[in-house]
Every structure is written in structure tokens, then in C-alpha cells.
Amino acid sequence: MTATGPRNGTDAVDVVALGESMVAFRPSRPGRLADVPSFERGIGGAESNAACVLAAAGHSVRWVSRVGADGFGDHLVAAIGSWGVDVGAVGRDPDRPTGVYFRTAGDRATDAHEVAYYRAGSAAAAMSPDTVDTAALRACRVLHLSGITAALSAGCLRLLRELTAPGPGRPLISFDVNFRPALWRDADGPRVLLELARRADLVFVGDDEA
């Protein structure tokens, strides 16, 4: 894929992707997190990954999220924008950090690996109908969401419920279930994800989630 320049604006686009992206640190060589001496910086986020791929394929795409007013937030916005994704609706939070995570290389035979997330209290976890530009979210043909966002906080879940509620002018809803048990603070995860999936027009689900 060839990176292009960032797009910014509030005009209608083909696809809007809403979700947290984090700075990803991957080891310079195989080994446990306790033993690896150095890491290479990248980015990670199911929704922003989809946005970058769609933009590279020629679609007009907007990524909506919140990042910290920090260097990691700057890196995420610049990296995702370099694929031609509209990043003009990404909010900056002066009080909460950008999330990061560390991941070891997977075992070739079993894909076993370690992941350490540092996302609790992140800027993206503070997303809600009050902190996100909902007009920018609705100005599209397709709105792409995921179950990860629903698990981040009560405000994030409230935002997804508002966006998926039936009503005139609602864009087509694309929903990636993306069930991550460790993110849910109670046993309501499957019930909430089923509720959101039933509201969606297009649902992506893995074999282990069906």
C-alpha cells in the first residue's frame, strides 16, 4: 500500500471508523517481555487499521477517536493520516494519555505471545456522546464500529448505543464483534455485543465468537 497525504474536513465520506488506536511496541527480537532489550514503535487498532486499508483502496474514510495531548497521540494522528484518512475529527484530551501496548513475537508453532496493555483511563476510554463529534460520525455512507469500543467505558457504550439506534438518516452500520473478555468488567459482554450486532446492518464475527 502507498501512503498518501492526510485528508481533513467534515464533508460526507464513504466510511467513518470509530475506535481507539494505541501505540504498539513490538520486540526487536523474540523473547519474553522481561527479557527483550528493545522495542520498535508502531500503531495498532482494529478500526483505524480498517480505515487505512479502505483509504489505500481509494475510498474516502474518516477516523474518529480521542488521543492524549502527548507525543504518542501526535504519532497516531500523523501515521493514520499519512494513509489518506481524514483525521480532522480526532479529539485531544489534555488530562488523559494515549494508550500503549507491548507485544512479544508469537511462537511459530502455537502463536503464543505476551501482550501488556496500558489503556486504562486512556483518552479514548473517555469517548461519549458529549466528547465526540457525532455529526462527523454520521456524515458517511457506512459507519464502522467494534465491540472493543463498547467495552472501554460506560460512556463509550452509550455512544455506540446512540449511533446504532434506528432512525432517519442513520448510515449503514458495520459492526466487528471483536469480543475481548479481558476488557469486560462483568459478565454482560456477550449480551451487550449481541444487542449491538442485532442493530447493525453488517456484522463481522470470528469462529470463536459465533
Question: What kind of region is each of these model predictions?
Answer:
Residues 2-86, 109:
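Glycine-rich phosphate/adenosyl-contacting loop at the front of the ribokinase-like
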Residues 10, 136-138, 194-197:
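A short, aliphatic-rich alpha-helical micro-motif
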Residues 60-147, 173:
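Conserved N-terminal subdomain of the carbohydrate kinase-like
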